[in-house]
């Protein structure tokens, strides 16, 4: 199924938190996770821990059309270093994108590639600053398999969130995006009101194990560590819709 990606702040924030947590053990790695529709390259999402100005300049100028890294990745399935001949020896003129990189002290980098069934290109690029280029590249080179799997898991999480949001939006009269099913929202709502799992089970007429099952799904969707984090994130991002008290039901 083809998924239309948009820049939803909540989903971007969820994936960025996931990437930040997974990459923490590797030190101060600067990254950019980019998703581009290969049939419509103007549709692009960028999630990065680099300065927001860099991301905005890149996106507003549609630099994905001239970025040699992206143009190389379109025809690759394996990860590559930016100083490979494929990138540096390009005969095309990419002065604008290279000038932007120099402004932010980016001298080299490494990109992991994924082509998904929806005809999207997903890349996870690590940008190396001049004073630490060799050190950072060694970290990436020594962990290539893990970082490739991180791209796969992050992209799977992203597509799952968009798919769930699209499904719930189509099944609802409301046009507001919602990534939670009705049951998940009910459970999250009562949990956010301070109810225990046992109390929620009584309110909704279901078992405690069913409550835990749905909470587990919510934790996976949001890419957080535990239920408390999921509830807090749901409240902070206004993702939980109010529900009316109901009689016990099967």
Curated annotation (Swiss-Prot):
GO terms for molecular function: DNA binding. PROSITE patterns: HTH_LUXR_1, HTH_LUXR_2. InterPro entries: Sig_transdc_resp-reg_C-effctor, TF_LuxR_autoind-bd_dom, TF_LuxR_autoind-bd_dom_sf, Tscrpt_reg_LuxR_C, WH-like_DNA-bd_sf. One of its GO terms (biological process) is quorum sensing. Transmembrane segments: none annotated. Keywords: Activator, DNA-binding, Quorum sensing, Transcription, Transcription regulation. Residues 173-238 form the HTH luxR-type domain. It comes from the Bacteria. Residues 197-216 bind DNA. CDD domains: LuxR_C_like (cd06170). Belongs to the autoinducer-regulated transcriptional regulatory protein family. Functions as a potential ohlL-responsive transcriptional regulator. This is Transcriptional activator protein EchR. It comes from Dickeya chrysanthemi.
């Amino acid at each position: 199924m083809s998924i239309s990606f948009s820049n939803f702040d909540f989903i971007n924030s969820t994936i960025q938190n996931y990437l930040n947590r997974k990459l923490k053990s590797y030190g101060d790695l600067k990254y950019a996770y980019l998703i581009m529709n290969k049939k419509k390259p103007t549709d692009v999402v960028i999630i990065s821990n680099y300065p927001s100005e860099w991301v905005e300049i890149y996106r507003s100028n549609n630099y994905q059309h001239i970025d040699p890294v992206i143009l190389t990745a379109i025809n690759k399935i394996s990860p590559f270093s930016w100083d490979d001949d494929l990138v540096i020896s390009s005969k095309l003129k990419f002065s604008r994108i290279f000038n932007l990189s120099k402004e932010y002290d980016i001298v080299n980098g490494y990109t992991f590639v994924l082509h998904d069934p929806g005809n999207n290109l997903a890349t996870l690029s690590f940008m190396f600053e001049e004073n630490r280029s060799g050190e950072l590249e060694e970290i990436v080179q020594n962990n290539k398999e893990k970082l490739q799997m991180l791209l796969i898991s992050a992209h799977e999480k992203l597509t799952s969130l968009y798919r769930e949001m699209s499904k719930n939006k189509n099944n609802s009269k409301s046009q507001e995006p919602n990534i939670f099913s009705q049951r998940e929202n009910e459970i999250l709502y009562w949990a956010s009101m301070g109810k225990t799992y046992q109390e929620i089970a009584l309110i909704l007429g279901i078992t405690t194990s069913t409550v835990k099952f749905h909470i587990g799904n919510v934790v996976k969707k949001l890419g957080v560590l535990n239920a408390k984090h999921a509830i807090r994130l749901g409240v902070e991002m206004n993702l939980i819709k109010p529900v009316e008290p109901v009689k016990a039901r099967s």
